[in-house]
């Protein structure tokens, strides 16, 4: 497949009107690179684990970070801004992750989508963790869905790729969704340069799309198994996984996420730092490619903090659990 065919395949996968591929280190960088969030716009985001990316990437834009992914928090922070769905703007942007932020929060995208349209806001969803397999964010109310393709490419992409998908604007009974129409017009007019992929890169992405459902189900299933193991581990506290009833968004997640509850688990260590745990683990837990088959750990609050975020691979969860257990007890 060439780039256009891959973009069309991704649009079909994401239920989108159109999709674009671009190179970017992560989703906020891709949104900035598009240039559709302009000086004079207001960008309201729930991204407490990615605040620096929003502080640096949107010069001239009024950026406000909210402490909750609720529609009420976004609406309150948007009061007084005279937003428009006209292409000229000014535009009000709402940004959330389908799974993200500290605690792996799952926002009610349906409620956010409704509230965004009432406020004349454009809802953008970072769908990287849940993926198009695990969350149909455009159907739920987003006008733009952005997804870093590390996991889609099974960790084999030679550079960081992001897919940008725009919602269909045709609603039932021939009504037009003004928010989606505005987002499409902005994407069409952003002047994004023609994107090129090498034959190897195109092959990696094509094979990734072909095997996506099977692999993502394996990631989700292993995450649940590891979450249940960690929930019973006496060396761990404050486990956060949307699939457990203890998670604050569990009820919402059952209606937002599909095929499970995503590949990520977050937890805090008792009486030791994340760096100390990494010292006791094989290097592959830290250095394996993002989105690949090997379970990977990260430190969202730094190595001196106690918070660990686990992204389940497709490797044997019994072996992963045994390795973690040994490191936690030594």
Model-identified regions with their sequence ranges:
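Conserved C-terminal alpha-helix-loop-beta "cap" of PLP-dependent enzymes
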Residues: 235-326
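N-terminal "arm"/small-domain region of PLP-dependent enzymes with the aminotransferase-like
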Residues: 1-16, 306-315
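Conserved PLP-enzyme active-site core in the AAT-like
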Residues: 5-235, 246, 327
């Amino acid at each position: 497949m060439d780039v256009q065919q891959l973009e069309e395949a991704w649009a079909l996968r994401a239920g989108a009107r159109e999709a674009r591929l671009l190179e970017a280190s992560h989703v906020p960088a891709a949104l900035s690179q598009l240039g559709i969030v302009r000086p004079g716009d207001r960008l309201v985001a729930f991204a407490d684990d990615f605040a620096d990316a929003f502080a640096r990437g949107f010069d001239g834009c009024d950026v406000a970070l909210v402490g909750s992914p609720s529609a009420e928090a976004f609406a309150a922070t948007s009061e007084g801004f005279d937003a428009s769905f006209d292409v000229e703007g000014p535009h009000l942007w709402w940004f959330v992750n389908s799974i993200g932020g500290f605690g792996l929060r799952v926002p009610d995208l349906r409620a956010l989508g409704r509230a965004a349209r009432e406020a004349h806001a454009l809802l953008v969803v970072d769908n990287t963790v849940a993926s198009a397999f695990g969350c149909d964010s455009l159907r739920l109310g987003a006008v733009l869905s952005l997804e870093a393709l590390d996991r889609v490419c099974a960790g084999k992409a030679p550079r960081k790729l992001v897919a940008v998908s725009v919602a269909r604007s045709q609603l039932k009974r021939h009504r037009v969704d003004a928010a989606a129409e505005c987002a499409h017009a902005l994407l069409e007019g952003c002047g994004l340069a023609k994107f090129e992929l090498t034959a190897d890169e195109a092959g990696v992405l094509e094979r990734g799309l072909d095997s996506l459902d099977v692999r993502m189900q394996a990631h989700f299933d292993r995450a649940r198994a590891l979450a249940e193991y960690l929930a019973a581990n006496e060396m761990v506290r404050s486990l956060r996984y949307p699939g457990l009833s203890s998670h604050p968004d569990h009820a919402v997640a059952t209606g937002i996420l599909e095929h499970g509850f995503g590949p990520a688990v977050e937890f805090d260590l008792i009486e030791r730092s994340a760096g100390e745990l990494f010292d006791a683990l094989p290097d592959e837990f830290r250095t394996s490619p993002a989105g690949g088959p090997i379970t990977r750990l990260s430190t969202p609050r730094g190595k001196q903090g106690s918070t660990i975020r686990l992204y389940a691979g497709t490797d044997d969860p019994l072996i992963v659990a045994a390795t973690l257990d040994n490191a936690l007890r030594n």
